[in-house]
């Protein structure tokens, strides 16, 4: 009997999957691969059903002969192992980023003469409703809040992009790329105080109050499912910080990052060019501990941002603070630098990891932007935040468009640079 292989990466079995099985049975015994959690995150979305439950769900489908684990988005390794006569899939993988997966399958099958079968993709109102329900569940606070911790345990490095509106949230949520035969997407979103302030036309001095910043979070949460890390600046007074923690936790935010400075906020990238005062270790530890005590769940993370390298206080001071902050209850450490060379960041990570192998390390490579995610992960970094790139890329484009319209007294000259209106309409889905 010939063997037919297909792979499912779903939390719910619907008529589309059953149609695949029905077609596959015409060609032979059906083997279904269940995509692992780690691979599912890179390819599709965070699973809402455990891997074990997904395996059981597929096992119970009539007509399935065997169920195996597929550990990678690409099929070449599982095809090499199983050598199926056929691989069957919906024809939606003929275009877009998924085409890379199909090309990978074709290449693997060619080695021994296997065949690929494309069946019409099933997407009707019933399937759309199922997808919508899954998205709604992923967006619920109790599911979203804990997802950052889960991702840290699953991913080599959690890729985080800055967002400051519902629209930028959609970009972070929906952008998937194919490069060098692999698919990738962002794992989490960063609500930056700099970018939030800039979008509102305000200076980055903690002028925008928490009520306004919470509205930004609401706008983003309304249209996304990915976990959110909140830029809490200094955290403010300890007496105020505990209320911020409680509010963010209730909303479903996954983490807050607070920096160990006091007084009027100045952006860290100014370094010693402006007066910036670093908080005492004792006082900042008290703030961290107070925040941890007020939490109602273990899901929410308080991450301590160390400014010692920014303020040229030295590596020893940075490490001393890191270990003290962890002892006070910090769930993670963010180390920052304004140097283009990442050497001091990597030195800190290596020295910290010698004594602490478990506490997550966060970096923001705005200045030292030549280093890759893989290199950071090799030095023990768990979360990388691209903290302002969407804002910084949008402003020059909008400014140039405004200038050209004024220059030519019409909009024709800018049209080639504009996103088609139909693409904007399709980006924002109706309920």
Describe each PLM feature range.
Residues 1-141:
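Nucleotidyltransferase catalytic core that binds NTPs
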Residues 11, 72-73, 121-124, 235, ...:
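Short, surface-exposed acidic/glycine-rich loop or hinge patches that mediate macromolecular interfaces
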Residues 35, 72, 92, 194, ...:
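Flexible loop residues that form catalytic
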Residues 58, 79, 130, 172, ...:
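Hydrophobic packing residues within well-ordered alpha-helices of enzyme cores
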Residues 60-62, 91-104, 115-121, 216-222, ...:
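Short, basic, helix/turn surface patches
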Residues 69, 89, 118, 304, ...:
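Structural signal for conserved beta-strand scaffold positions within catalytic alpha/beta enzyme cores
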Residues 136-148, 167, 389-431:
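Extended, intrinsically disordered, low-complexity segments
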Residues 141-366, 370-385, 393, 400:
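Alpha/beta enzyme core
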